[in-house]
Amino acid sequence: MAGIKEACGVFGIYDLDGGNVVPSIYYGLTSLQHRGQESCGLAVSRTDGERGNVQFHKDLGLVSEVLREDTIRNMEGDLGIGHVRYSTTGASVAENAQPLVLSYIKGTLALAHNGNLINTP
């Protein structure tokens, strides 16, 4: 075997009591780091807050490099997702880091996936 080969890692969590899930996402992604070492990110929101208010951070690098304490210190949410990437297609560039965060007419959507989107621009 020529090196680590996995296929991304996706982590999601919701705290029913309204607690901050950012630390849990950080530790979850650290536990999944073996599944992807190219990039990582997280997105969080408050279910009792303003609709469409999603905080996120993503970039190239390992969890410990991208989600540094000074970066995520002010992030808070009771609902969140995280992603570590191992690319099978697509360049290893910051634009391909996840979660994908999209604004649309009803608010903001954060999405993380493991797979390839074909027939797309």
Name these PLM-found stretches.
Residues 1-121:
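N-terminal glutamine amidotransferase
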